[in-house]
């Protein structure tokens, strides 16, 4: 609630206030260095806001996919790395075992017994993502997931919340249902729909990012592009 954050003298997030609904999948966009990753880290509790408060419900389980893969034990076998978290992940279709999940992520049965140190950088990234998903989060924070997270894999989350930083237009159009855009002075503007809907809304208003930057020197006042319906306490986390 009313969260602000300044880093190294730069106001990155200015009086941000939002209640996340159960079914929301939020895409955070903006220029490099504007505060997108900072916002995710505050949501995960890795850093604290300078003012305001982030409230997290008692039943929330957060999974956080950072931009960089954390250190791994290179001697550990792929299947062991995943089973350290869980033997299976529950879905509406039933339990999916760690081995089955690995196959979904392109690790065939033989590869599952490969030492982690033998994996390529991309394979380690996929393995890291799977480990986050095996924790069965109901809120998933993704910092530039790139091509590692395909659309079918998102079904594992079922009705969970997704908050993602991404520059991938296809991903944003197919995964998110609301865009949060950094538009200057630490302000976030919210738009209903995916990235194409965001562009269309900007065009309708006659205020593309380039035009607004020229007119206002990159400073945009905070607003919500589409009115939000009143939220029930039961719908929020």
Locations of regions flagged by a protein language model:
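ABC ATP-binding cassette signature C-motif
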Residues: 1-237
């Amino acid at each position: 609630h009313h969260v602000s954050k300044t880093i190294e003298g730069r106001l990155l997030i200015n009086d941000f206030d939002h209640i996340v609904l159960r079914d929301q999948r939020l895409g955070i966009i903006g220029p490099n260095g504007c505060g997108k990753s900072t916002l995710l880290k505050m949501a995960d509790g890795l850093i604290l806001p300078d003012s305001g408060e982030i409230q997290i419900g008692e039943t929330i389980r957060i999974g956080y996919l950072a931009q960089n893969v954390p250190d791994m034990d290179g001697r550990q076998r792929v299947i062991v790395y995943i089973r350290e978290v869980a033997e299976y992940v529950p879905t509406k279709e039933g339990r999916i075992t760690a081995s089955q999940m690995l196959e979904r992520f392109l690790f065939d049965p033989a590869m599952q017994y490969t030492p982690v140190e033998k994996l390529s950088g991309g394979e380690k990234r996929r393995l890291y993502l799977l480990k986050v998903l095996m924790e069965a989060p109901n809120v998933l924070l993704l910092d530039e997931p790139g091509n590692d997270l395909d659309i079918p894999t998102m079904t594992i989350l079922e009705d969970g919340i997704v908050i993602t930083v991404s520059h991938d237009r296809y991903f944003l159009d197919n995964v998110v249902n609301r865009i949060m855009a950094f538009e200057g002075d630490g302000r976030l503007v919210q738009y209903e729909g995916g990235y194409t809907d965001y562009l269309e809304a900007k065009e309708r208003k006659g205020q593309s990012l380039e035009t607004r930057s020229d007119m206002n020197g990159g400073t945009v006042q905070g607003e919500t592009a589409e009115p939000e319906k009143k939220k029930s306490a039961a719908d929020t986390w």
